[in-house]
Amino acid sequence: MTDRVSAGNLRVARVLYDFVNNEALPGTDIDQDSFWAGVDKVVTDLTPQNQDLLKTRDDLQAQIDKWHRHRVIEPLDPQAYREFLTEIGYLLPAPEDFTITTSGVDDEITTTAGPQLVVPILNARFALNAANARWGSLYDALYGTDVISESDGAEKGRGYNKVRGDKVIAYARQFLDDSVPLAGASYTDATGFKVEDGQLVVSLADTSAALADPGQFAGYTGTAENPKSILLANHGLHIEILIDPESQIGATDGAGVKDVILESAITTIMDFEDSVAAVDADDKALGYRNWLGLNRGDLSEDVTKDDKTFTRVLNTDRTYTAPHGGELTLPGRSLLFVRNVGHLMTNDAIVSDAEGAEGAPVFEGIMDALFTGLIAIHGLRSTDANGLLTNSRTGSIYIVKPKMHGPAEVAFTCELFSRVEDVLGLPQGTMKVGIMDEERRTTLNLKACIKAAADRVVFINTGFLDRTGDEIHTSMEAGPMIRKGAMKNTAWIKAYEDANVDTGLAAGFSGKAQIGKGMWAMTELMADMVEQKIAQPKAGATTAWVPSPTAATLHAMHYHKVDVFAVQKELQGKTRTSVDELLTIPLAKELAWAPEEIREEVDNNCQSILGYVVRWIDQGVGCSKVPDIHNVALMEDRATLRISSQLLANWLRHGVITSEDVRASLERMAPLVDKQNAGDPEYHAMAPNFDDSIAFLAAQDLILSGAQQPNGYTEPILHRRRRELKARAGA
């Protein structure tokens, strides 16, 4: 039984109530009683609107399902389909042209293009690593990944391999030549660095060279005659060359260079949503406490490596001597967003006894806005009471709002933020919104969605996986879908990615707000990432998601190769897609799959689902590196789970597979997943007692009940089954 404290119409779990009163409120100048009165009023006033928005989702889906079931024209008539969606209010008229007016936004969002990390807020170590990933070692990123081949004696091994190290140095030198070139010379031939008359001078064997563009020299540390580091800038990002001839690496380098540091994760999203398993008050309080530590600057974590333990803390800012003297200070940490949950889920960390509520759990998205907003106040001030580190330098709080369906839901988010600002005593417009373009109704009405948040929006971002999950679920009754691996090559995907950029640019995003693109999920395949992910900045995206600090450093190289703002200038004014392209449903043209192909698809998806769900349910891990059926490590979160479960639910609905096929595949794949997790002492095997494994049953539910889940979301089943396991463990 949860211990609760009454606050007006609300009954708040004591663990959350005490955290807010004793840890979050002190230093904010907000009175405890007035805060909880404000929470009560916001929850009571806005809950009916939230419920109405969810009813609209269900009503529209029911009408679309009915239309597909009863349509007589085959194949689908695009004009009739478009007219139907317009008639029911799913497809809305586009507003007149406009320009966003958001103000008080940090440079990391407006004028700097670079990588964006997303990390689970429940893991303090991950959160610290991500916040500190603003700067990363290129040498380490190259040496430790497959970007540098292990052929010709360049194996990683246990100790330092000079053959591999030399390849790393050569790669980094080429990067410098490409990004911050010397006039008539190469960094490969450098023998030293110094500063003369505010200019960088690079010594060569018999002469010296300057930068081809002297304006790329940004500063240094040490003395002008004997600098310890050289700071360079390109496309708004910084590169720092570290010099130490006495170090292990510097001693082998002709110029004494020991490392090249890249400005990497410019922004980071601290995630309360798809990458976490937060199902009750204890989980929410842990997430809020970590968010508080990040904003106060006092979050820390003891880390043990090679039998040595140290305490990881947040980095301070970095100070350099400017080229002509004086001090230059650069941020030492990534600018932090926080991703709240969407409009769907409730959480009984707070229950409401307001009229008609009868003890119902409160909408979690409303809770998140109130509590993450409150906590973020600490990140706006540098005082003894708030901590000495700040997040925003312009007085803004950045909240990513996921899984919104259409402009009415965006408008509701803006109303929620406005009400929260009133409770917190913040100026209107302090709480900025990042709009995830990951639901079909938002994609089709993106211009109207942006218009609804024109004075708050700071980013739009595509999310291929969730968007595909919604694509499948919306058209669940239309027929069987193509295989998961083929989705990336469909007409609607290209139209979706292009339309997001075009719409953002038309609304004045360039130089004012981020246009983002999705995650690289193959965490170990960094050579492939370096080769392929450059397509995102080339497409006009000012940021794109990466799965680790190492990946952020490697992806940062792409923004040195591509001037994203120049690309945006070329794309400005273009409309490269049509509504009909966006409405192209990825249906299989004919069911020509061989039985072994169907079995392969089912096994692949069942293995992926089990591999993620077993850690979610049994260990409360919401974001995992899950080996696929071929043992390739993939970054999995609820978005990947949504597409896998929805595809199988679709095939089940249309008779491509049976429930017996699903069960047989799950039973085949569970022992494989058990084997892949054999090295984890906390792991509980699913085989052979499948029906005793709550995780196994959750995976089965997600497929067999997938067609009935709201918009294909996985949270309702996951939360119910995780709470069931917690109850069993506590019994």
From Swiss-Prot:
Cofactor(s) essential for the protein: Mg(2+)
Reaction(s) catalysed by this chain, per the record, are: glyoxylate + acetyl-CoA + H2O = (S)-malate + CoA + H(+)
Q: Per its UniProt record, what Gene3D superfamilies does this chain match?
A: Malate synthase, domain 3 (3.20.20.360), Malate synthase, domain III (1.20.1220.12)
Report the protein name in the record.
Answer: Malate synthase G
Kindly list the positions annotated as binding glyoxylate: R339, E438, G463, F464, L465, D466
- Cellular compartments per GO CC: cytosol
Q: Name one GO biological process term.
A: glyoxylate cycle
> Which Pfam families does this chain map to?
MS_C (PF20659), MS_N (PF20656), MS_TIM-barrel (PF01274), MSG_insertion (PF20658)
Q: Which NCBIfam families match?
A: malate_syn_G, PRK02999.1
Active site at R339 (proton acceptor), D637 (proton donor)
